[in-house]
Amino acid sequence: MKIEGSCVTFEPCDAAFVKKFGPLEAANMVLDYHSVHPNMPFLYDAEQLAGFFGISCGELNHIVNHIQKEYKKAFLPKKDGTYRSLYIPSIRLQFCLGPIKDRILSQLPVSKFATAYQKGSSTRKNAEPHIGKKNLLKLDITDFFGSISFEQVLCAAFNTRYVSKQVGFLLTSLCCKNDALPQGSPTSPALSNIVMRRFDDQIGRWCNQRQITYTRYCDDMTFSSDRPLYGVYQK
């Protein structure tokens, strides 16, 4: 569909949506959504989602139904001599994940305490708020991406108004492997921050009330303060 001012022009992939609600109600729904999310695509059903990717609905369903085969496992050497497992999406899956990352996930809010995977972010910037503090504590989240579940992704990123359960399920299915975020997928970093937003905000508020500085860079949580940090362990 194309939106110019208060005029909505529907395309062939919007046919089922328009038929279900009628042209006037469908246009009002689109304009209502666009007024709140001007930079995000309106995706109500599978046909619109396929059109968003520039593929057929049949091809979209095929990718989702065979998602395990759309990833190749690779191994990245680590400094300690061990290897990190990565799951690299196929070219055709990347054609779907790219627009999800650039057009949808980039518009969703993340916590101010999350410092990774954003424009201008770096480990150095993550460390800056902690400089000069007497006490420093670093905690690591084990199996960070693998611990973020299908349900968490669906609820945090794709469970919004005018996104049907069908589309939410399809988007989540494209972004997950084995019911979790695959490390190596282009959408996993952004999704991890989106899913962790509530956690980061809760921990951040708790720390602020106790004069503790908190930041999270991917799976590394850093706490610092001029006071003892014993309470962090208990939390």
Q: Where do the protein language model's features map onto the residues?
A:
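Non-catalytic, polymerase-adjacent accessory regions of viral genome-replication enzymes
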Residues: 1-72
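Generic alpha-helix structural propensity
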Residues: 41-44, 55, 59, 71, ...
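N-terminal low-complexity, intrinsically disordered segments
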Residues: 43-58, 102-104, 108-109, 152-157
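Reverse-transcriptase-like RNA-dependent polymerase core
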Residues: 60-79, 162, 166-172
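Short amphipathic beta-strand starts and helix->beta connectors
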Residues: 70-71, 121-123, 206-210
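Active-site-proximal segment of RNA-dependent polymerases
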Residues: 93-138, 143
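Conserved polymerase palm-domain catalytic core
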Residues: 129-218, 222-235
